[in-house]
């Protein structure tokens, strides 16, 4: 980018661009204010402002003078270049015209029929001044005209080539003909010889044949020699052609290299031009700065001079400084007056020199003017006393003579025409009278016809009026009916618009439900994870609470009720497990049946029902698993109580391990369930997409019906789900009550087992070493525990083992049944999804089948249409062939006509060439006369310009002289005169009506200038006339004026 564009751009754009490019912002130009100094009155302030303005104007004038000098120098350079270009163009035009003339002469020499009207026209145009044509043409016209001229020259060259080709063909034909004649002559000679042998009687005929054969032989030899020479020349030309082709190839390669170099140089040239532009712009800036600095320097020097004149030089001796202030001030005033006088004297001397120079120029101009007047008078005398021979020899006299003869002949022809027209007028008058009589008779007949037609039209009008009345009545009836039906139509329109809005809202709700579905799926995953963590923590809390309660109740209960409570607890736990498993299976079966019924009832709302079924099943399976986990420690405790071999710590460790395993199994099961749900959700999403596509393909009425049905089904399904949830809540309450009873029984069993274990420990501690309880007191009986080592204890233990095994078998059976139920549910879900997919695929296939059938029908119709088009095209082809044959015949006729026109064009071209020569002579004479007139007019204009300039200077000198006379007469100084002039100027600038304010408004009617307030007050007070010329004006006739 050059610096001009950056400087010309606005401040805001520059700052933005600089901030975007990371460059510092461009500094703003600040103009220093001019200090006027202390001012006492408005007149002094105006004088100082005017002085400053005059200085600025002087600076601008100097700059303008410099720019004018530079531009003049540039104009001179451009004029020189233009003259050179004009000379080159003239040379090119001259040689181009000469080439066209030579080509035309060659064409006329070879074949007179090859000339063209366009070429003659172009030649006629070319003979006129080429530069004048170039100046009149635009860019587009110039390109077109020059291209046409180039095409003309190309055509001429092509015609020369055609002529040469024709000559070559003609020569070849001649050679072929001559060869054929020679062969025929040879054959005739051999036949004549045979006839001479057979008929030896005709000796004279033999002599003739021998002489003719000798002549033919000589011709053949000459033709052979010429043919050999032509062939050798042809070989030479071919060799030359090949060598020229080689040279052309090499030259073209060099040309390409030079072109590449040229393009590189052009790019360098463009870069250098840009640099030159930038440097020129910098140079202009520097010149402006230099001018400003020079002006500032000049002002500073003037101020220094004035300061030195007022206060004296500081370098002078101190004696001069010791002089009194009064003498210094008086000297300063005298020095100022002396300087002003010296400046005025210098100006007077300069004006005197200018006046002397102008006087000398005026004397010279007067002398030349007198000489020119003498020459003009001589020429006038010569023109008045011209001899007859000169007049007769002039071309103008000859032209007038020829025009007179032509006009005389025309006048004679016009006389004859007049006589003929008079005769025709008389005949036409007679015919006109006859026609008038005929017209009158026809008018009477037409009037009768019009009257009869008017009567008929009146009858028709009466019929039309009757029809109009009937139609009007029908129209009023229709209008009444329309007024009745109009509100119904409006209601229907409102209904349609409301339904359309409802459809749009439903579409938005569908998108919102999709988003909600995604959010609920993510929330579902999070809730499941939280549920698994909560279950794990609950199980741990329950186990801790159970162990703490068992430890407190051991001391309160006796060991006698252990067996009975254990047996009761075992039976109760078995029954609860069975009931729980039965309830779980029943719930799962019910849910499965419910899901299958809903899927069979409604295919469209299958996705939501399946998801709800999956959630319910997961909850039920989770409850069953939790119940199994809670019930599973029962048999382990019974076996431990029976064996009495494993301690409490080992049992706690084993319980913690089982808990960890159960938690991991729950987590793995939840992960698997979530993955399965994810797959099912994706399948449901695909199915919903298919349903959406199907929904889009259906019409609006069907969509509305489907939406209503779907909303009804959704509401019904929601009601059924709420009912199921109520049932499940009731069942869950029952199960929780049962679970609480089972947990209390298990706690009691654990408490009793722990009491039994502690009692056994106490028994072991209290047992003596010699196993004799009454050794200390003989005669006393030993106290023994009942059922120790008895059959009843063994039977109880066996029963306990059997019940534990039965409980384990029941648990295994329950788990197997749950797994089978899950597998069945998965299979049912898969079958249902496959069924939905199959139904959708069936629908899609049906639609594809219908689409393909439609395509087949359209294809068959297109094929039939193409067959019809083919037949039509064949018919058109036949008709076109017939038209082509007729056009060929017309072409033959037109070619013959063209040849005739070409011959006529050649004749007209010859006549045009003769006329061209005469025109050239006349143009040369005209140019000479124009040059003479232009020289004289330029000299006269220069004299007039000089006289005007002298008059202006004289007027200026007169003004200055009058000013000086006034000063001498009044005895005032220059300052007073200047003040008077300033006062006069101020008076001219003040408003003439109020004589207070400045002129700042102009009337567009009379162009008198006043202040804006005066004109506005005049307009408001209805005095709407100009104060000077009483010209009326309006609101739009006075405008603001800004004088500087």
UniProtKB/Swiss-Prot annotation:
GO process terms (BP): chromatin organization; negative regulation of heterochromatin formation; Notch signaling pathway; positive regulation of cell differentiation; positive regulation of DNA-templated transcription; proteasome-mediated ubiquitin-dependent protein catabolic process; protein monoubiquitination
Region of interest: Disordered: 182-214, 312-335, 546-586, 615-664
Positions with biased composition (Polar residues): 567-586, 635-647
GO molecular function, one term: zinc ion binding
Pfam family, one: zf-C3HC4
UniProt feature, compositional bias: Basic and acidic residues: 552-566, 615-632, 649-664
ZnF start-end (RING-type): 991-1030
Domain of life: Eukaryota
Modified residues (Phosphothreonine): 242
A single GO cellular-component term on record: nucleus
The EC number(s) this enzyme carries: 2.3.2.27
Low complexity bias: start-end ranges: 320-335
Stretches assigned to coiled coil: 43-81, 218-386, 417-546, 664-767, 794-970
N-terminal signal peptide: none
Transmembrane stretches, start-end: none
Record pathway: Protein modification; protein ubiquitination
Keyword Metal-binding: yes
Cysteine disulfide partners in this protein: none
Keywords: Chromatin regulator, Coiled coil, Metal-binding, Notch signaling pathway, Nucleus, Phosphoprotein, Transferase, Ubl conjugation pathway, Zinc, Zinc-finger
Location in or out of the cell: Nucleus
Modified residues (Phosphoserine): 243, 632, 638
Key word Isomerase present: no
Family in the record: Belongs to the BRE1 family.
Function: E3 ubiquitin-protein ligase that mediates monoubiquitination of 'Lys-117' of histone H2B. H2B 'Lys-117' ubiquitination gives a specific tag for epigenetic transcriptional activation and is also prerequisite for histone H3 'Lys-4' and 'Lys-79' methylation. It thereby plays a central role in histone code and gene regulation. Required for the expression of Notch target genes in development by affecting the levels of Su(H) in imaginal disk cells and stimulating the Su(H)-mediated transcription of Notch-specific genes.
Name listed for the protein in its UniProt record: E3 ubiquitin-protein ligase Bre1
Gene: Bre1
């Amino acid at each position: 980018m050059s610096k001009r564009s950056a400087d010309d751009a606005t401040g805001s754009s520059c700052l933005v661009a600089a901030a975007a490019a990371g460059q510092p912002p461009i500094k703003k130009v600040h103009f220093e204010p001019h200090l006027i100094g202390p001012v006492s009155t408005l007149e002094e302030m105006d004088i100082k402002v005017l002085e400053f303005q005059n200085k600025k104007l002087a600076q601008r004038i100097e700059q303008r003078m410099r720019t004018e000098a530079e531009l003049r120098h540039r104009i001179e350079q451009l004029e020189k270049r233009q003259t050179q270009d004009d000379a080159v163009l003239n040379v090119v035009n001259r040689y181009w015209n000469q080439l066209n003339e030579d080509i035309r002469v060659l064409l006329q020499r070879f074949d007179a029929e090859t000339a063209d009207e366009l070429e003659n026209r172009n030649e006629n145009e070319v003979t006129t001044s080429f530069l004048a044509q170039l100046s009149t043409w635009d860019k587009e016209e110039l390109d077109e005209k020059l291209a046409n001229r180039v095409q003309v020259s190309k055509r001429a060259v092509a015609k020369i080539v055609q002529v040469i080709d024709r000559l070559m063909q003609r020569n070849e034909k001649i050679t072929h003909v001559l060869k054929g004649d020679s062969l025929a002559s040879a054959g005739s000679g051999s036949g004549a010889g045979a006839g001479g042998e057979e008929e030896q009687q005709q000796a004279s005929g033999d002599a003739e044949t021998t002489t003719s054969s000798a002549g033919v032989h000589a011709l053949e030899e000459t033709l052979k020699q010429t043919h050999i020479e032509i062939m050798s020349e042809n070989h030479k030309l071919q060799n030359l052609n090949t060598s020229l082709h080689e040279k052309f190839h090499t030259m073209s390669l060099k040309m390409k290299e030079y072109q590449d170099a040229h393009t590189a140089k052009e790019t360098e040239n463009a870069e250098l031009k840009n640099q030159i532009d930038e440097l020129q712009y910098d140079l202009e800036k520097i010149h402006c700065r230099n001018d400003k600095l020079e002006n500032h320097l000049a002002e500073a020097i003037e101020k220094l001079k004035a300061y030195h004149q007022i206060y004296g030089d500081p370098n002078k001796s101190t004696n001069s400084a010791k002089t009194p202030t009064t003498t210094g001030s008086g000297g300063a005033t005298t020095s100022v007056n002396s300087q002003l006088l010296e400046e005025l004297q210098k100006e007077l001397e300069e004006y005197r020199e200018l006046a002397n120079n102008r006087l000398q120029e005026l004397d010279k101009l007067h002398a030349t003017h007198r000489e020119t007047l003498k020459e003009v008078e001589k020429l006038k005398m010569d023109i008045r006393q011209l001899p007859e021979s000169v007049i007769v020899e002039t071309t103008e006299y000859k032209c007038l003579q020829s025009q007179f003869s032509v006009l005389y002949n025309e006048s004679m022809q016009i006389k004859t025409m007049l006589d003929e027209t008079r005769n025709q007028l008389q005949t036409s008058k007679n015919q006109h009278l006859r026609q008038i009589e005929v017209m009158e008779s026809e008018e009477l007949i037409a009037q009768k016809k019009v009257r009869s037609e008017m009567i008929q039209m009146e009858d028709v009008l009466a019929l039309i009026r009757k029809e109009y009345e009937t139609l009007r009545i029908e129209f009023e009836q229709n209008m009444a009916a329309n007024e009745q039906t109009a509100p119904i139509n409006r209601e229907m329109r409102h209904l349609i618009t409301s339904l359309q809005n409802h459809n749009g809202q439903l579409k938005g709700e569908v998108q919102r439900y999709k988003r909600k579905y995604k959010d609920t799926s993510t929330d579902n995953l999070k809730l499941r994870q939280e549920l698994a963590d909560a279950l794990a923590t609950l199980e741990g809390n329950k186990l801790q609470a159970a162990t703490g309660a068992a430890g407190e109740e051991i001391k309160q209960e006796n060991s006698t009720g252990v067996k009975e409570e254990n047996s009761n607890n075992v039976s109760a736990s078995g029954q609860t497990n069975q009931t729980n498993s039965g309830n779980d299976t029943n719930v799962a079966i019910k849910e499965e049946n419910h899901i299958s019924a809903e899927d069979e009832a409604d295919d469209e709302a299958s996705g939501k029902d399946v998801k709800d079924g999956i959630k319910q099943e997961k909850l039920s399976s989770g409850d069953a698993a939790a119940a199994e986990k809670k019930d599973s420690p029962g048999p382990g405790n019974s076996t431990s109580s029976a064996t009495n071999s494993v301690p409490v710590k080992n049992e706690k460790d084993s319980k913690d391990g089982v808990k960890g395993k159960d938690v991991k199994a729950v987590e793995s099961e939840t992960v698997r369930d979530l993955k399965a749900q994810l797959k099912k959700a994706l399948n449901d999403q695909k199915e919903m997409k298919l349903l959406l596509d199907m929904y889009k393909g259906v019409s609006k009425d069907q969509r509305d019906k489907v939406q209503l049905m779907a909303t009804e089904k959704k509401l019904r399904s929601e009601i059924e789900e709420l009912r199921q949830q109520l049932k499940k809540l009731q069942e869950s309450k029952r199960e929780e009550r049962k679970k609480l009873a089972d947990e209390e029984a298990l706690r009691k069993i654990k408490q009793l087992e722990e009491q039994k274990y502690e009692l056994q420990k106490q028994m072991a501690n209290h047992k003596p070493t010699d196993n004799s309880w009454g050794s200390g007191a003989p005669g006393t009986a030993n106290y023994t525990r009942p059922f120790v080592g008895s059959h009843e204890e063994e039977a109880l233990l066996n029963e306990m083992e059997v019940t534990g095994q039965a409980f384990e078998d029941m648990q295994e059976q329950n788990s197997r049944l749950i797994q089978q139920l899950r597998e069945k549910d998965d299979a049912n879900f898969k079958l249902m999804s496959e069924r939905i997919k199959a139904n959708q695929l069936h629908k899609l296939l049906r639609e594809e089948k219908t689409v393909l059938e439609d395509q087949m029908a359209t294809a068959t119709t297109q094929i039939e249409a193409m067959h019809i088009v083919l037949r039509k095209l064949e018919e058109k082809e036949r008709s076109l062939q017939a038209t082509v044959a007729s056009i060929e015949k017309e072409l033959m006729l037109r070619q013959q006509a063209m040849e005739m026109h070409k011959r006529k064009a050649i004749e007209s071209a010859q006549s045009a060439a003769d006329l061209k020569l005469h025109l050239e002579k006349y143009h040369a004479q005209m140019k000479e006369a124009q040059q003479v007139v232009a020289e004289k007019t330029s000299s006269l204009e220069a004299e007039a310009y000089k006289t005007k300039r002298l008059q202006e200077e004289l007027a200026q000198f007169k003004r200055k002289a009058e000013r000086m006379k006034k000063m001498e007469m009044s005895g005032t100084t220059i300052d007073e005169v200047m003040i008077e002039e300033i006062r006069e100027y101020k008076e001219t600038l003040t408003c003439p009506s109020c004589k207070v304010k400045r002129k700042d408004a102009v009337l567009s009617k009379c162009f008198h200038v006043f202040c804006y307030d005066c004109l506005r007050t005049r307009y408001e007070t209805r005095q709407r006339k100009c104060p000077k010329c009483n010209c009326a004006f309006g609101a739009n006739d006075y405008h603001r004026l800004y004088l500087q």
